């Protein structure tokens, strides 16, 4: 069986286990990672790579860091083959309809809390703040 191609969009530590799991799965090939640009962190304002970028480079996966994915999407899409799936885990930007229609099979979002109670960011922190006795993860196909 041919491996399904994935473009992975994610940024924080929360997204790294999902990226690693997809890379380890023999049914998938993560061909590209898209993450937020490196940002100044701390008092020293040291330029720091997002955790997903660090993991992707360790795994040998090419990384793109557009400031605004929607604005740069046409250039990105023209430079690589359409993936079977676009997997988004805590990427940090709203995606345009053009981005959502890019994958051949589906754009998939992994959200850090069960929907609909856990809408928005940061879902895990909201669960703790509201004293939720349990929480979960929502996996959904994005359409709009």
Task: Name each model feature, range by range.
Residues 5, 84-85:
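Structural motif
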């Amino acid at each position: 069986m041919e491996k399904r191609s994935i473009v992975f969009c994610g940024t924080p530590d929360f997204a790294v286990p999902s990226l690693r799991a997809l890379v380890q799965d023999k049914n998938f090939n993560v061909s590209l990672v898209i993450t937020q640009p490196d940002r100044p962190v701390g008092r020293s304002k040291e330029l720091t790579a997002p955790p997903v970028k660090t993991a992707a480079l360790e795994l040998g996966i090419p990384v793109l860091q557009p400031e605004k994915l929607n604005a740069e999407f046409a250039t990105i899409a023209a430079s690589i083959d359409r993936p079977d799936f676009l997997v988004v885990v805590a990427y940090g930007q709203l995606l345009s309809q053009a981005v959502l229609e890019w994958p051949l099979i589906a754009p998939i979002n992994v959200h850090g809390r069960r929907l609909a109670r856990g809408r928005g960011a940061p879902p895990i922190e909201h669960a703790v703040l509201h004293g939720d006795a349990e929480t979960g993860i929502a996996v959904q196909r994005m359409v709009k």
